[in-house]
Amino acid sequence: MAMLLGASVLILWLQPDWVNSQQKNDDQQVKQNSPSLSVQEGRISILNCDYTNSMFDYFLWYKKYPAEGPTFLISISSIKDKNEDGRFTVFLNKSAKHLSLHIVPSQPGDSAVYFCAAS
């Protein structure tokens, strides 16, 4: 099963970056689409991810701190449009090929690199 990753950075005033998927061709199939995001502690943080392949049926979010490996946060299958786990909620809009991660409330410990993945 192939898995594609995009990444963004959350620095409590979230600094998401564009990252190419790990495809060998130029077609980006998963990408983060927020160039920057400023969030106050206690507010909602929203990270967005778009994908191009309608055959994807499973979507995951990971969090990575410097000098550590990625940690799984939350996932959603293509048969759902919402999944909640504690402060994290992921929304999936299949017709728009878009998913978003909502973090409520934002905390200083949320400052990290966030990865969106699809398979």
From Swiss-Prot:
<dbReference type="GO" id="GO:0005886">
    <property type="term" value="C:plasma membrane"/>
</dbReference>
<dbReference type="GO" id="GO:0006955">
    <property type="term" value="P:immune response"/>
</dbReference>
<dbReference type="InterPro" id="IPR013106">
    <property type="entry name" value="Ig_V-set"/>
</dbReference>
<comment type="function">
    <text>V region of the variable domain of T cell receptor (TR) alpha chain that participates in the antigen recognition. Alpha-beta T cell receptors are antigen specific receptors which are essential to the immune response and are present on the cell surface of T lymphocytes. Recognize peptide-major histocompatibility (MH) (pMH) complexes that are displayed by antigen presenting cells (APC), a prerequisite for efficient T cell adaptive immunity against pathogens.</text>
</comment>
<keyword id="KW-1279">T cell receptor</keyword>
<dbReference type="InterPro" id="IPR007110">
    <property type="entry name" value="Ig-like_dom"/>
</dbReference>
<keyword id="KW-1015">Disulfide bond</keyword>
<protein>
    <recommendedName>
        <fullName>T cell receptor alpha variable 29/delta variable 5</fullName>
    </recommendedName>
</protein>
<feature type="domain" description="Ig-like">
    <location>
        <begin position="22"/>
        <end position="119"/>
    </location>
</feature>
<keyword id="KW-0325">Glycoprotein</keyword>
<keyword id="KW-0391">Immunity</keyword>
<dbReference type="GO" id="GO:0002250">
    <property type="term" value="P:adaptive immune response"/>
</dbReference>
<dbReference type="InterPro" id="IPR051006">
    <property type="entry name" value="TCR_variable_domain"/>
</dbReference>
<keyword id="KW-0472">Membrane</keyword>
<feature type="signal peptide">
    <location>
        <begin position="1"/>
        <end position="21"/>
    </location>
</feature>
<dbReference type="GO" id="GO:0042287">
    <property type="term" value="F:MHC protein binding"/>
</dbReference>
<comment type="subunit">
    <text>Alpha-beta TR is a heterodimer composed of an alpha and beta chain; disulfide-linked. The alpha-beta TR is associated with the transmembrane signaling CD3 coreceptor proteins to form the TR-CD3 (TcR or TCR). The assembly of alpha-beta TR heterodimers with CD3 occurs in the endoplasmic reticulum where a single alpha-beta TR heterodimer associates with one CD3D-CD3E heterodimer, one CD3G-CD3E heterodimer and one CD247 homodimer forming a stable octameric structure. CD3D-CD3E and CD3G-CD3E heterodimers preferentially associate with TR alpha and TR beta chains, respectively.</text>
</comment>
<dbReference type="GO" id="GO:0042101">
    <property type="term" value="C:T cell receptor complex"/>
</dbReference>
<dbReference type="InterPro" id="IPR036179">
    <property type="entry name" value="Ig-like_dom_sf"/>
</dbReference>
<dbReference type="Pfam" id="PF07686">
    <property type="entry name" value="V-set"/>
</dbReference>
<keyword id="KW-1003">Cell membrane</keyword>
<keyword id="KW-0732">Signal</keyword>
<dbReference type="GO" id="GO:0042605">
    <property type="term" value="F:peptide antigen binding"/>
</dbReference>
<dbReference type="InterPro" id="IPR013783">
    <property type="entry name" value="Ig-like_fold"/>
</dbReference>
<keyword id="KW-0393">Immunoglobulin domain</keyword>
<keyword id="KW-0675">Receptor</keyword>
<keyword id="KW-1064">Adaptive immunity</keyword>
<feature type="disulfide bond">
    <location>
        <begin position="49"/>
        <end position="116"/>
    </location>
</feature>
<feature type="glycosylation site" description="N-linked (GlcNAc...) asparagine">
    <location>
        <position position="93"/>
    </location>
</feature>
